Amino acid sequence: MAAATTIPAPAGRARWTRLIPVAIIVYVISFMDRTNIGFAFDGMGKTLHLDSAAEGLAGGIFFIGYLALQIPGGHLAERWSAKKFVGIMILIWGVFAFLSAFVQNYTQLLIVRFMLGVAEGGIWPAILVLISHWFPARERARAYGFWMMNIAIASIITAPLSGWILTWGDWRSLFLVEGIFPFLIAAPLWWLLVADRPSQASWVSREEREYIETSLARENADAPRSAGLREVFRSSVVWRLVLVYFFIQVGFYGLNLWLPHLVKTTIGGSYLIVGAVTASPDVFAIAGLWINAHSADRTGRYSLHVMVSLTIGAVALVLSVAFGSIVALSIFLISIAMAGALAYDGPFWASASQAVPVALAGGAMGLINALGNLGGFAGPYVGGWLQDASGGSFLSTAVVLAVSLLLGGLVMITLRRQADKPTVTPPVPGRVPDQARTRR
């Protein structure tokens, strides 16, 4: 690691105030189009004659399609253009989101959901790569955490919006209205306001551009050279990160897709009320994401921050069902569970972005996201199957999802020496430390 005297002081805010907000908006709409099926289940189940297991499969098959472009998406973002790749995929996912309103049977539903997964699949690793081109390592957990607020923001918007649409329309209306957003909002913002690198952005000041490029150049100069993508597949660190991410996605997506059903079972009421209550846990999640990411960047203990947040989420999830008869307490515990199940994100991806040489980061993050997101298929499907098997009880589902979160945390803590890279403390005015601090 270069001496701290060579590390430039942070300059400018455009990367925080322009790039990240646009990326958030794009992924909010993406996340909305993949998870609004949770609100459609009630009406769709009646129209298409589906049981809970079939609904879980329809929700989860998205993640099988999601595999297809993960590694290519990250690789193309690194070697070609994140802006162009994501811009094209926004238009393709919009087509399949809109077509969801017109399915006439279960087979068509599975096909459309699968293709929606294919279309959205490469966007996540591509945006991760884009952020790595704009933020030095010492800012990256905060940058990833800030961007990943999109998941909580999407839920806050999707839940009441979907509930409101269902008060005057049906599940087809839900897909029609929300399927327009990729064309109306996401694509124009992305194509007009995003640049692949600071050197291509006219809206970045010279000082900020020099700070970013100088910082990244010095980090990349210290990085080991790479012989090819095969190194990603040979890395035990990458495969453990895949396992961690799989366990997390089982827990998170199992909770996220079944949350509207859990809330409706707990409190009853109209779709509008269910939507409003379902959104409330994500306010906690936004706070958890920012606090955990900021603390992780400050200490450099990324693995520990992942484990602690997942443990909190797992315990709170089981308690929320155990105390389901006390509605206010149950909703509060669900909120804590959602915060824990999301707050891992910034520290996790900060670790992943540093686990391999810079040239392979896109492919590595694509592999982690691709195979890890199979948990997004398993969680909803297993959750639905367990509810059918237990006569509609969510307790067994909650226990399985919580155990999965705990397992993710336990595997992550074994990576603390490999994935927690040295971090550089920003210079304190008037004081230049002798060397950067290394934290484990």
Q: What does each of the following model-derived ranges do?
A:
Residues 112-150:
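Cytoplasmic helix-loop-helix junction between adjacent transmembrane helices
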Residues 79-90, 297-310:
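Cytoplasmic membrane-interface "Motif A"-like loop-to-helix N-cap segments
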Residues 68-107:
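Conserved MFS/SLC helix-loop-helix module at the cytosolic interface between two early adjacent transmembrane helices
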Residues 147-201:
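Helix-loop-helix hairpin linking two adjacent transmembrane segments in secondary transporters
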